[in-house]
UniProtKB/Swiss-Prot annotation:
Belongs to the universal ribosomal protein uL10 family. Pfam families: Ribosomal_L10 (PF00466). Forms part of the ribosomal stalk, playing a central role in the interaction of the ribosome with GTP-bound translation factors. GO terms for biological process: translation. InterPro entries: Ribosomal_uL10 (IPR001790), Ribosomal_uL10-like_sf (IPR043141), Ribosomal_uL10_bac (IPR022973), Ribosomal_uL10_bac_type (IPR047865). The keyword rRNA-binding applies. Keywords: Ribonucleoprotein, Ribosomal protein, RNA-binding, rRNA-binding. GO terms for molecular function: large ribosomal subunit rRNA binding; structural constituent of ribosome. HAMAP family: Ribosomal_uL10. This is Large ribosomal subunit protein uL10. Part of the ribosomal stalk of the 50S ribosomal subunit. The N-terminus interacts with L11 and the large rRNA to form the base of the stalk. The C-terminus forms an elongated spine to which L12 dimers bind in a sequential fashion forming a multimeric L10(L12)X complex. The lineage of its organism: Bacteria, Bacillati, Chloroflexota, Chloroflexia, Chloroflexales. GO terms for cellular component: cytosolic large ribosomal subunit.
Amino acid sequence: MPTPRKIETVSTLTEKLNRAQLVVVADYRGDGKGMSVADMTELRRKLREHGGEVVVAKNTLLKIAAHNTGHEALDPLLAGPTAVTLGYDDVSKVAKALLDYLKSGNKSFTVRGALLGNTLLPADALEQVTKLPSREQALAQVVGGIAAPVSGVVGVLNAAISNVLYVLQARIDQLQPQGETA
């Protein structure tokens, strides 16, 4: 029988997994002795600055939450001591903050894999995620792609109207006697 605390934990994890655009699964005891509280606090602070967070929970509860959200692909990654990094808004910034932390020399935190949207990625693909455009950049590219043809049409229509006006002005100039001006 599930306890109320476990039910609440699964509910919270389900909500967080639903919101997350990026889910990175890692072992937080990679070198055997595990991460210190100070290291985990530093990682959490860095991720929070970029719209992410780290959650440590039991694998069984994470699996239930993953199944609740349709992220069954996470199942093979959920074994052993597991920390889940969640990126909510700008996934490239969250991935970069995580990679920067990993490159700082902490061997206790080793990435097993990631889920970007509904795509399962191997651990080494996290670097590619850092190269994705931010949400604002992606929206700007989409708007630019949509606006470019529209501005081209406006330019063509504007040129056509101007050409008609130039032809009319030339005809008026032809019809007027040489001494008069319009």
